[in-house]
């Protein structure tokens, strides 16, 4: 079966402490949002210490058109993905021409030609590499990208795939949107990029086998999360039902994933999840009947980087893989939720 070999990350160039983000929100929302101070504790309740963003904080104080923001996305995503790929290929002793497939995941910017085409030129990847851009899966995109690569490589065991994800959530900020959803996004979201190497059975690469994958689109949930496309750009959509959906569906989804691999919850060593936020991790813990400490890798990445949408779970995997060697036994569940409303999951052999 295909294996996850390595994950490398690239950080956005600017750091913003959570206290500074809260001060920014007070200045930006203060005159337009009644009873703003009642909502401000959400900045501390997230547990986030700092985040990385693509532009200096002062840039976000004024409105920018979709064209300007999208150009900034393309530039940042291309540069950061290239940096992450160079790190990964050097660490694994691989040449760019050793890569046969390229997957590019994002939801926060638009590009035609797609970013993967730009990366072939920047990195010197094969011009015959098969390219698969994946857009619109939001926070679930990182897991979906890994799962798609793994399924494709089942029939191509001698091939290697790079799965890129790059999200510049901060660039979607609308300075004149004073909704609660935009305030919540200001407290949670950040920017980052990552790349994973997934290899077929016959490459000789040694990593963590991807044993099975699962996708689920929940009924009557299209309005739970996503974008509203407005003249000024992408306007964030959130619904308070997310913890309720987790409570209703998460346990059954976990059991279905495990059953496909012939194992049970007792066989799970690690939960490597997209953190989303504290309420999301708590809802998972309640649904599974476990402590939130089981999500420590996710919680720590969220503390240090915030929610980078599809990229976040790859940061979680990068930390875990750098601290462990393959083959010590056990299983890790990797999962994320995204627009649709949907769930993506995969099972790693450890």
Where are the regions that the model predicts?
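Active-site-adjacent elements of ketosynthase-type condensing enzymes
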Residues: 111-118, 163-184, 212-231, 277-286, ...
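Short beta-strand segments
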Residues: 6-8, 105, 135, 161-167, ...
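Short coil/turn connectors at secondary-structure junctions
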Residues: 1-2, 96-100, 127-130, 155-161, ...
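Claisen-condensing/thiolase-fold acyl-transfer catalytic domains that form or cleave C-C bonds
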Residues: 82, 108-109, 118-121, 126-128, ...
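Conserved beta-ketoacyl condensing-enzyme motif
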Residues: 46-127, 131-136, 265-281
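Condensing-enzyme catalytic core mediating Claisen C-C bond formation in acyl metabolism
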Residues: 1-75, 175-248, 252, 337, ...
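Short, well-ordered amphipathic alpha-helical segments that serve as non-catalytic structural scaffolds
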Residues: 44, 76-91, 115, 193, ...
């Amino acid at each position: 079966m295909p294996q996850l070999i390595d994950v490398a990350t690239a950080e956005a160039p600017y750091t913003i402490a959570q206290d500074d983000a809260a001060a920014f929100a007070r200045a930006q929302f203060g005159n337009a949002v009644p009873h703003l101070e009642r909502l401000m504790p959400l900045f501390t309740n997230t547990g986030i210490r700092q985040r990385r963003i693509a532009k200096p904080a002062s840039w976000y104080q004024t409105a920018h058109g979709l064209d300007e923001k999208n150009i900034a996305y393309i530039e940042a995503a291309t540069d950061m993905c290239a940096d992450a790929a160079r790190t990964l290929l050097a660490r694994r002793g691989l040449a760019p021409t050793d890569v046969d497939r390229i997957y590019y995941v994002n939801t926060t910017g638009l590009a035609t030609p797609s970013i993967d085409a730009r990366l072939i030129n920047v990195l010197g990847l094969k011009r015959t590499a098969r390219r698969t851009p994946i857009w619109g899966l939001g926070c679930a995109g990182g897991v979906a990208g890994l799962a798609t690569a793994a399924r494709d490589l089942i029939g191509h065991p001698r091939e290697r795939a790079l799965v890129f994800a790059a999200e510049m959530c901060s660039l979607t900020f609308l300075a004149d949107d004073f909704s609660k959803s935009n305030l919540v996004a200001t407290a949670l979201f950040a920017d980052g990029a990552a790349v994973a190497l997934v290899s077929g059975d016959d490459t000789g690469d040694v990593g963590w086998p991807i044993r099975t994958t699962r996708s689920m689109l929940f009924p009557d949930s299209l309005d739970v999360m996503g974008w509203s496309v407005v003249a000024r750009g992408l306007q964030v959509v959130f619904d308070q039902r997310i913890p309720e959906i987790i409570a209703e569906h998460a346990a059954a989804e976990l059991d279905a994933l495990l059953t496909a691999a012939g194992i049970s919850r007792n066989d799970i060593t690690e939960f490597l999840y997209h953190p989303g936020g504290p309420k999301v991790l708590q809802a998972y813990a309640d649904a599974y009947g476990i402590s939130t400490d089981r999500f420590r890798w996710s919680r720590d990445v969220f503390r240090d980087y915030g929610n980078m949408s599809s990229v976040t779970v790859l940061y979680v995997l990068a930390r875990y893989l750098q601290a462990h060697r393959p083959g010590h036994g056990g299983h890790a569940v990797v999962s994320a939720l995204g627009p649709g409303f949907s769930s993506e999951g995969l099972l790693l052999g450890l």
